[in-house]
Amino acid sequence: MSGHSKWATTKHKKAVIDAKRGKMFAKLIKNVEVAARTGGGDPAGNPTLYDAIQKAKKNSVPNDNIDRAVKRGSGLESGGADYQTVMYEGYGPNGVALLIECLTDNRNRAATEVRTALTRNGGSFADAGSVSYLFSRKGVVIVAKAGTTEDDVMLAVLDAGAEEVNDLGEAFEVLSEPGDLVAVRTALQDAGIEYESAESSLVPSVSVPVDEEGARKILKLIDVLEDCDDVQNVFANFDASDELLAKLG
């Protein structure tokens, strides 16, 4: 399992996420609000907002909360904060490279939270540019198998700009350039294939293999980072087998 694959890490952390559902809801709602502020409140004309709404719905965020977030982001309702996207770079145990994406209205608070989480869990802050070059921005669509074959997926996305389809065990991962993400997920929808998530993500070009102890440490660090209110996503370039992750899960 490559560190960028949200599918396996999401399965591993399901019990943790269930215990922190309120915090997860808040982050998903923040994502919707920022997408609406950046590209407008109409999902039909704002693919980023569409995907943020779909992700929130798939995680059972109430429709009323989603609607209010869109209105706040669009300026139709007061109360929205001035969130900014900030990317921090760091290293975890075993030299695993980390990119920590935050949405925050207080950069100093976010930096302090991230630095504390790193230093208390075997990691360290890194200078800007020392880690980011190891990752590339890609469109990532996750398709649960559920009777769908790799050939089905490849046939659907072949002409939509997909670069590769990877078998993750219980799901397929479709990679594309970020600009082709909408075309890829639309092609899947047109083919009647359900997808779990569609989003712009950071994919590592080089991965660091980790053993059981290393995987345990890096997963703990990711859990702590993602528990920070301002942290939206954590991208890591570790590589561990599905069997190992299943054992740790």
Swiss-Prot record:
Location(s), subcellular: Cytoplasm
InterPro entries reported for this sequence: Integrase-like_N, TACO1_YebC-like_2nd/3rd_dom, TACO1_YebC_N, Transcrip_reg_TACO1-like, Transcrip_reg_TACO1-like_dom3, YebC-like
Cellular component, GO, one term: cytosol
Keywords associated with the record: Cytoplasm, DNA-binding, Transcription, Transcription regulation
GO function terms (MF aspect): DNA binding
GO biological process, one term: regulation of DNA-templated transcription
Broad class of where this protein is predominantly found: cytoplasm
Annotated family: Belongs to the TACO1 family.
Protein name as annotated: Probable transcriptional regulatory protein Strop_1792
Organism: Salinispora tropica (strain ATCC BAA-916 / DSM 44818 / JCM 13857 / NBRC 105044 / CNB-440)
